């Protein structure tokens, strides 16, 4: 925030007249997100420390038009054998001890393939992650995409014999899209910052199926 101090002072002064609200600083992109009255935008653009102004662009997840058909349980799923993930397991590279953040629609943290290796957020984050969209601890996945991706990454195969690529990895859930797959740039950046601030090793942002 040191590099943003002059702009922040300018914005905070305008909160008293209700021309500015909901100020949020980002460090990973040196950006400030806020709501402003349209009449104030031109004046804001004249500030010497502001390089650019843009909308908090809405982002949408791309889903398959047709549901993916369930396939019979196999010993090893095709995606794993295609990239030889099972070969490296034999050398001990199973993701053990590695924390992976899945930034998506949330996760079913009670899923049998995931619940035994969830990130320990302590009392501050009791549900093993955070809901950026609603700014609370409810990371429940009402869409299914986030849980699907989490399983692809680190499902441990408890419910059958299909597993994720890194079945011993630790899962952190960062909910950045709502149940319809809608989000915005501010929430995506906030999600990445949350993961980095909590010492994540890898972050996966809403991968395509």
Q: Where do the model's predicted regions map?
A:
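Solvent-exposed, acidic/flexible segments
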Residues: 1-4, 37, 78-81, 132, ...
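Extracytoplasmic/secreted envelope proteins and their assembly/folding machinery
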Residues: 4, 8, 38-41, 47, ...
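Autoinhibitory propeptides
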Residues: 8-90, 120
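Glycine-rich, acidic and aromatic/proline-enriched surface loops and short helix-turn segments
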Residues: 13, 155, 194
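Solvent-exposed loop/turn segments at secondary-structure junctions
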Residues: 29, 39-41, 59-61, 105-109, ...
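Subtilisin-like serine protease catalytic core
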Residues: 87-128, 134-185, 198-201
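Short acidic, glycine-rich surface-loop motifs adjacent to enzyme active sites
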Residues: 192-209
